Structures are given as C-alpha cells and as structure tokens.
Design a protein with these regions (language model features):
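Low-complexity, acidic/polar, glycine-enriched regions of mature
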Residues: 21-199
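Bacterial N-terminal signal peptides that target proteins for export
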Residues: 1-9
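Extreme N-terminus of proteins, especially the signal/transit-peptide cleavage junction
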Residues: 3, 18-22
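Bacterial N-terminal signal peptides
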Residues: 9-17
C-alpha cells in the first residue's frame, strides 16, 4: 500500500465516527402539534393549530450544535375550531393562504442552553417575509422503539413573534381602549420524530 493510499484510508477511518454520530429524523405529524396563541380583546387568548406540516431534523449527538432542522407548514390547514374565525384568519387580512400557502423555518445556528436545552436560530418565512427567530427547545429525548420497529425521539419548542413584522397588520380598536387582536403570537411545537431508514 502506497503512502498516499494509507493517508486516504486513515482519513476515512477518522471520518467514520463523525458520520455515524449524525442521524436524520422525520417529524411524525400524527404524534406532533404545531400551535399558536394570540391575545383577544386584551382579556384572553385564542389558540389554534396547523394540521398539515412536514419537517426533517438532523441530529448530531457528538456535537449537538451541528444539528439542523427544516419545517414546512401548510397555512391553509390552520384551525381554531371556529369556522368563521378560521375563514377570516385565512383571508387577505391575515395569513392570505391563497397567496402564501406555506410557512417555513430553516435553522442557521444551534447553541446549548441551560439544563440540556437548546436555542435554535433560524429564518422564519411567513406571509412572504423572512425574519430571524429563536426557538427555545427542550432537551431532546433518548431513543425509543415503537411496536412496529420505528426508532423515535421527541422534544418541544416555543418562540414569540410580532405579527406586524410579517405584514399581519389588520386590527380593530376597542371602545374601552386597546385592540381586538394582540400583536404578539406565541408559537409552540410538540414534536415526535421517526428515524429515517438508511438508504
């Protein structure tokens, strides 16, 4: 074996542990939830969910800061349980789902937080506008096997955005002061993931 071949072989051997430490996981929409809440009339919160979404998480257990996440949400799948309100939220006054049928999050940076949590910084694209947001992520669970042989992990995350930053500016003033809809939206994710099969 020539000297050059030995160097190449050694390099591949050193790279193998790093490659093995990264794994790909698909978000399971049947056991996950993408929700939001916003203040209504300054007195209570209206909560809702997006029922259709996909996501891929690349977890690097050797160096968690090298992990990545991408989530795609179908805005027409929005529901709050009240049809008339849902129709208004899907209209041009708010999400304009016909014009902007998807909302996406693409991570750019992952950093460690306290007690095993993470802060995931990324680009959120909503209503045709892209802004940087930070997800506060709970510790990712250990692996668990389901009865059908799938390997699963889970986590949860939250972030807050100002809807006006994304062009969602519709509102009505109240006679008693304040506005009908709050500006701050809390987005919450309950995520269960299935490990992708090796190709």
């Amino acid at each position: 074996m020539s000297h050059s071949i030995r160097i190449i072989a050694l390099s591949l051997m050193l790279a193998l542990p790093t490659l093995a430490s990264a794994s790909t996981w698909n978000i399971d929409p049947d056991h996950s939830q993408v929700g939001f809440k916003v203040k209504h009339m300054m007195v209570s919160n209206v909560k809702g969910n997006f029922e259709k979404y996909t996501g891929v998480v690349e977890i690097n257990d050797k160096d968690i800061t090298k992990s990545k996440v991408t989530v795609n949400i179908e805005t027409p799948s929005l529901t709050t349980g009240v049809q008339k309100r849902d129709e208004h939220l899907k209209s041009a006054d708010f999400f304009a789902v016909t014009t902007y049928p998807t909302m996406t999050f693409v991570s750019k940076k992952v950093s460690k937080a306290g007690k095993g949590g993470l802060k995931v910084t990324g680009d959120l694209t909503l209503h045709g506008i892209t802004k940087e947001v930070v997800l506060n992520v709970e510790p990712i669970s250990k692996e668990s096997k389901d009865p059908w042989g799938n390997t699963r992990r889970g986590t949860a995350a939250t972030t807050k955005i100002d809807r006006k930053d994304f062009g969602l500016t519709w509102n009505k003033g109240l006679e008693t002061g304040g506005v009908l809809v709050g500006d701050e939206i809390t987005i919450s994710l309950e995520i269960e993931m299935i490990r992708a099969q090796a190709k």
